[in-house]
Swiss-Prot record:
Organism encoding this protein: Theraphosa blondi (Goliath birdeating spider)
Protein name, entry field: Kappa-theraphotoxin-Tb1a
UniProt GO MF annotations: ion channel inhibitor activity; potassium channel regulator activity; toxin activity
InterPro entries in alphabetical order: Huwentoxin-1
Source superkingdom: Eukaryota
A Gene Ontology term for the protein's cellular component: extracellular region
Tissue expression profile of the protein: Expressed by the venom gland.
Amino acid sequence: AACLGMFESCDPNNDKCCPNRECNRKHKWCKYKLW
């Protein structure tokens, strides 16, 4: 399966976001990992 891009909805407990992105627990979408 393809990874999730920016602002795609995601599950924080099963993070499928693309590399250098993380699932935001508050908004439930993928965002850039700043650190």
